[in-house]
C-alpha cells in the first residue's frame, strides 16, 4: 500500500515513507531557512518535540506549530501552492491543480538527486527526476497531477 503519483502520460509509485522523504526534500528548496527548519521540526514534533518544548499535549504543540507556520508563510510571502502541497494529507489528497504544478515546477526545476523515493529493487523505482517529469508535464500541458 502506498501512493501512485500520475498524470496523463506517466506514473510513479512509492510508499508513504518515500512520499514523506520526497516532500522533505522539496521543503529544503523553499527559499526561506526559517520555513525549512520548521518543516523539519514536523517530523520530530510528531513524536517528541512537543515534550521538549514544554507542551502538555501533542494537540497544544500542533496548534502552536500551525500558528508559527502560518506566521512564517505570511511574513516571508511564501508560495501558498507549494506550502499546501507540502502539508496536504497524503491520505486524502487526490489531485494537484495545473496552477499548483506550475508553482511547484518553478521551485524544483533546477534540483535533482539520486535518492530512491520509490520501491527499491523495482526496475522502475521512482527518483526525483521522475517526479519532476510528472510535475513539468502537468505544468506545461495544464493537466492535473493525481494521487491514488
Regions found by a protein language model. Give the residues of each.
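Acidic (Asp/Glu-rich) sequence patches and key acidic residues
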Residues: 1-148
